[in-house]
Amino acid sequence: MMIDKLYKRVEKNGHVCAGLDTSLDYIPEYFKTKYFNEEDIIFNFNKEIIDATYDKVACFKIQIAYYEALGLKGLRAYKRTLDYIKESDGIVISDIKRGDISSTAKMYARAHFEGDFETDFITLSPYMGLDSIEPYFEYMKQKGKGVFVLVRTSNEGAKDIEFIESKDGNKVYEIIGKKLKNMGQDFLGNCGYSSIGGVVGCTHIDEAVKLRKDLGGMFFLIPGYGAQGGKAEDVALYLKNGNGGVVNSSRGILLAYKKQNDEKNFAKCSRNEVIRMRDDILQAINSK
């Protein structure tokens, strides 16, 4: 199961999930001049980042919107990036946030768990109901794939829906989390975590301890570190015995060269940022 592989990769490399949310604006101008089209520019930039960080990250997350926005050339760069990571025995989370009725969800599952865009994990939205998640189960059972479902997200607007309370006082995100935890019991890996994970932002530390306790067997994809204000000590609250989650950073890693004022060595700067982030999180875990 991919969840077991991810768990082991966290044990080996740490908790960093490097986000390849690659915009042309993020790429140094000198690097762009080396290639003739946007597909090659983006893929080769990604390749440099992957090569520089592979041994220090748990996984990579690719936000598909950045590639869809460029049309076919962007999707070709997306596919080449997926293929390159898989050839390197890396782990990929495709951030697609799909959520639709069962018949449509079957097509999304087919699109991203086999064929040209096959990946290891995808992100899903639960807000059309849990039957919108069930079509992915076949691939979880037969191919060991995994999903991360939106539970408590890191954006400010999350409170508009996720904080709505039911009659018994439970918030929407709490209800969703518990339902997903129950569904996940059929997909537990040897590591003790389920192939049904949750997206839980680290910008709400007042909820962290309760979430981790209530959702004990759920592996977390944790956004919000760095640019959105989440700190390593916040992240540590969402982990369990030093594992149970990966922490995503996209701009912080891709644009590290700007902070270090060294665009010629952008990949090395990204590696340095991954190592800094990894060590920051490990120190917070050990201090907890």
Swiss-Prot record:
One of its GO terms (biological process) is 'de novo' UMP biosynthetic process. Its EC number is 4.1.1.23. It catalyses: orotidine 5'-phosphate + H(+) = UMP + CO2. The active site is at residue 97. GO terms for molecular function: orotidine-5'-phosphate decarboxylase activity. Keywords: Decarboxylase, Lyase, Pyrimidine biosynthesis. The keyword Lyase applies. It comes from the Bacteria. Pathway: Pyrimidine metabolism; UMP biosynthesis via de novo pathway; UMP from orotate: step 2/2. NCBIfam families: pyrF_sub2 (TIGR02127). Belongs to the OMP decarboxylase family. Type 2 subfamily. This is Orotidine 5'-phosphate decarboxylase. It comes from Clostridium tetani (strain Massachusetts / E88). The lineage of its organism: Bacteria, Bacillati, Bacillota, Clostridia, Eubacteriales. The gene is pyrF.
